[in-house]
Amino acid sequence: MELRFPRFSQGLAQDPTTRRIWFGIATAHDFESHDDITEERLYQNIFASHFGQLAIIFLWTSGNLFHVAWQGNFESWIQDPLHVRPIAHAIWDPHFGQPAVEAFTRGGAAGPVNIAYSGVYQWWYTIGLRTNEDLYTGALFLLFLSTLSLVAGWLHLQPKWKPSLSWFKNAESRLNHHLSGLFGVSSLAWTGHLVHVAIPASRGEYVRWNNFLDVLPYPQGLGPLLTGQWNLYAQNPDSSNHLFGTAQGAGTAILTLLGGFHPQTQSLWLTDIAHHHLAIAFIFLIAGHMYRTNFGIGHSIKDLLEAHTPPGGRLGRGHKGLYDTINNSIHFQLGLALASLGVITSLVAQHMYSLPAYAFIAQDFTTQAALYTHHQYIAGFIMTGAFAHGAIFFIRDYNPEQNEDNVLARMLDHKEAIISHLSWASLFLGFHTLGLYVHNDVMLAFGTPEKQILIEPIFAQWIQSAHGKTTYGFDILLSSTNGPAFNAGRSLWLPGWLNAVNENSNSLFLTIGPGDFLVHHAIALGLHTTTLILVKGALDARGSKLMPDKKDFGYSFPCDGPGRGGTCDISAWDAFYLAVFWMLNTIGWVTFYWHWKHITLWQGNVSQFNESSTYLMGWLRDYLWLNSSQLINGYNPFGMNSLSVWAWMFLFGHLVWATGFMFLISWRGYWQELIETLAWAHERTPLANLIRWRDKPVALSIVQARLVGLAHFSVGYIFTYAAFLIASTSGKFG
């Protein structure tokens, strides 16, 4: 018998319909479901594929460096970071003739180019890169790492180099190595790079391999370290009139605690950043010696978990049985990893703009907007994935006997209470927030804006005040000049921090009012509803009141008629699918809020946000409509400009988004009938009927069509907003 795709499933390979192709693609990466898979081979396949993933990442970052070195303007950008526009790469073939060529020739380039809104120029400049040669060197090194990763991936699939199952299940050793090696050593190495290369570069000193051993990063070298006078490393920091990249106003300190921002670059002090990474390295190097391996010192994770039992009362058996449950479930581990990564990605979005680490990035407004939006959307997808794999864990890996009366079992036991409380919170937030917005809308429409219900966010203002913001007049903690907290930090990091918090030229602790209060609660509604759908999907994955027997139906069973009371939208996959729409919706509100508030801040007209954000028509008219004008003008009767590509992407994004509904709002019968008609016509058309196919064409399954619809909806939604965001910001600020 000939081998047909998919080789990993003989059952599917013998399917006579086109279902074979689509199901084959859908399950290609679901190694667990493949024929003759063993637990050991499963782990080995996943391990090897990680090297492939690394190879792609290294190749991609190498490409960034290479194209900027080849076609960019890094060296001229360095001379004037605030006014030269950074070039990402050239455009080979600008369509639409001479006007397009002229529109896209910018940034001092000889021909049409794309502008970089990724922040890589600021990043490379901050870490000490200065020439195109530096960029080429980096690109080659990453290309080498990419090749090395591919070789490592192939190598770990060879019989002699395949790790055993026991190696994968050795959680203590893995944690020690990841904590010490991955986080500890890499943070220490990064501190080293900052101290030996980046900080000297910021002071006009060019350190490379040829003079690396000759240039002391600190005048007294290791002396203060060896004599215990560590405070010397913080003495004589860069002054407030330091010009970044030059010796003018530069100090000699390497590890400081200045707080706040460098006045010229509006980014964190490099010496503060180095200090931070050194502290992180210290903590993680210690943490990496915490767990017991074959040396017989440290904690056993299993013992730790078994010991975590409540002292008394009806609180169950705590963490008993959790070690084996987690250690034997790849989906549980992936769920935990994705949840952590999702949170950290969202925190990256928040901190990249509020505490910018890269020189001059805070004054590149389009880049700030792009990076915030990019990281928030990625966080959303990763976090929904965490719950998806949590649900798969319950279906494939959860063993009730192993987890009797522990925290996992008890979550399942009182899932109705969890779900109903989340539901209540979502309903409360939704009705009250919408009620306030709509009330305010009506008041504006009737010409009585003074009758709006405007609520000051006094608790949030109080928290900001506790951190040192004096605008609101709360005399508390760091905003109280005679408090112990204020006095304790006055000589250390406080002057810089307090200046940063109370200065209106940055994004740290923006002044908030009734508009912020409302949109905050709209976002809270989105977060709680998304969480409700995801949590319910995971907790009901094995069985629910309607259908107690879900286990054998798997993760993604489709609608199954009225026989069991109707099984539409009750598989764990359906919950994930519905949650992604809510996730996109929520992050839409988050990014609208962030962008509008910042546009008004950067333009110096914050009153526009404050006055228009308290009612829905304000958002529609003064944010969306007003800011889409540049976009819609990309093409006009007078020709075109450099925003035309975003205008096109805006339209194209809407098209992709709308295509999603074709898959989401239709039934299989319609498509099957259409397919049969087309196949019939094909077979009866001369010449066309010379082309035959073996698989009988059938419509997509319900689950597949939903996936295709969701993919188009998501991609179109993000493309549309990306074009709007970049065009409206760069159209105003360049």
Curated annotation (Swiss-Prot):
One of its GO terms (molecular function) is chlorophyll binding. It catalyses: reduced [plastocyanin] + hnu + oxidized [2Fe-2S]-[ferredoxin] = oxidized [plastocyanin] + reduced [2Fe-2S]-[ferredoxin]. InterPro entries: PSI_PsaA/B (IPR001280), PSI_PsaA/B_CS (IPR020586), PSI_PsaA/B_sf (IPR036408), PSI_PsaB (IPR006244). It holds the Pfam family PsaA_PsaB. Phylloquinone binds at W671. Chlorophyll a B3 binds at M662, Y670. Keywords: 4Fe-4S, Chlorophyll, Chloroplast, Chromophore, Electron transport, Iron, Iron-sulfur, Magnesium, Membrane, Metal-binding, Oxidoreductase, Photosynthesis, Photosystem I, Plastid, Thylakoid, Transmembrane, Transmembrane helix, Transport. GO terms for biological process: photosynthesis. [4Fe-4S] cluster binds at C559, C568. Belongs to the PsaA/PsaB family. Its main location: plastid. This is Photosystem I P700 chlorophyll a apoprotein A2. One of its GO terms (cellular component) is chloroplast thylakoid membrane. P700 is a chlorophyll a/chlorophyll a' dimer, A0 is one or more chlorophyll a, A1 is one or both phylloquinones and FX is a shared 4Fe-4S iron-sulfur center. NCBIfam families: psaB.
